[in-house]
């Protein structure tokens, strides 16, 4: 089981990359998975715990180290079931060391491909025949945004928001590089393992804004589609190929799905619902969830709140309702007729 996180990749740009289209043809692609928290630490801990931030302990930027001891996360569960586990991260505090045989981090601007290729090789060698779980964090988009964009433009610099096309063009170059990495790392994985028994999941933790909303230069400030709508691509011998679904899902659905795919039962309840049957048997019209929830509290911007979430939204396949706690304002959008969320109909 290999997770490949393409940090900051937007679901609505996947169509610009031939590399990603090629990968997409090899598996089942879900392009409407709502990130319960649209920034990396919060997002990944929801994915691995199957719990919302309020339940796993990490629901704010300031609570990076607050993962509850009373819960179990995916690497712990897999390790208890005989897996050798490893990860490479942008920062060693993104996920807890709990459940990892190898827990490492890379520096900003590192050679992600070489580092991840070496980690894969090391993991399979050290596993000595055990099944392997590896989490690879590709952070190019994050690195460039944090190191180049944020220092150059303050959140209230109007010039940034007035050059949306230029911002998106710059983003697309980074996105294409991320997809090129994804294709290359897939080849490395294929060369090392028995593809019959391997599941690869390419995923995004959140999208990256390009100046669509005043006050958000990257992500984590609001809960609009460009940052909370994410994608998951499942590839494996037992997974159907050339399937695409835009039915609504949530990141709390990922853990039960992965456990189902691994044939692992747990003795505790999870709020999400597995969609493993869709991956293996075929997409149905009614699969998915009726409602998905997302929340955030920004580090900067118009309504910074790093100590607790202060922007909340609930969405269906048709509508999204957002509550901005700090100014006490509501927004309602018709996602079918206004997918860019331009007209507040509240």
Question: Which residues fall in each region the model found?
Answer:
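Catalytic domains that recognize anionic headgroups
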Residues: 1-346
């Amino acid at each position: 089981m290999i997770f490949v996180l393409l940090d900051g990749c937007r679901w609505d740009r996947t169509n610009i990359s031939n590399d990603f289209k090629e990968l997409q043809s090899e598996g089942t692609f879900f392009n409407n998975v709502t990130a319960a928290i649209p920034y990396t630490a919060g997002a990944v801990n929801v994915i691995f715990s199957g719990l919302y931030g309020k339940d796993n302990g990490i629901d704010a930027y300031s609570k990076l180290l607050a993962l509850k001891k009373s819960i179990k996360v995916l690497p712990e569960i897999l390790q208890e079931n005989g897996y050798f586990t490893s990860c490479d991260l942008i920062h060693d505090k993104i996920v807890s060391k709990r459940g990892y045989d190898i827990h490492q981090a890379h520096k900003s601007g590192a050679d992600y491909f070489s580092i991840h290729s070496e980690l894969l090789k090391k993991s399979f060698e050290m596993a000595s025949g055990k099944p392997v779980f590896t989490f690879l964090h590709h952070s190019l988009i994050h690195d460039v945004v944090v190191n180049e964009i944020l220092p150059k433009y303050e959140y209230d610099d109007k010039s940034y928001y007035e050059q949306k096309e230029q911002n998106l063009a710059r983003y697309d170059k980074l996105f294409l590089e991320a997809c090129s990495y994804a294709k290359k790392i897939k080849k490395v994985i294929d060369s090392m393992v028995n593809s019959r028994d391997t599941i690869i999941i390419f995923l995004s933790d959140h999208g990256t804004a390009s100046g669509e909303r005043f006050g958000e230069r990257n992500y984590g400030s609001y809960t609009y589609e460009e940052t909370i709508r994410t994608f998951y691509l499942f590839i494996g011998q037992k997974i159907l190929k050339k399937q695409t679904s835009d039915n609504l899902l949530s990141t709390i659905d990922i853990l039960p799905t992965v456990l189902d795919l691994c044939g692992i039962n747990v003795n505790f309840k999870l709020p999400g619902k597995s969609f493993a049957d869709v991956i293996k048997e075929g997409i149905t019209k009614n699969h998915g969830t009726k409602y998905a929830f997302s929340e955030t509290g920004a580090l900067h911007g118009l309504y910074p709140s790093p100590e607790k979430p202060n922007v909340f939204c609930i969405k269906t396949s048709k509508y999204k309702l957002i509550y901005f706690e700090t100014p006490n304002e509501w927004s309602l959008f018709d996602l079918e007729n206004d997918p860019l969320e331009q007209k507040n109909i509240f």
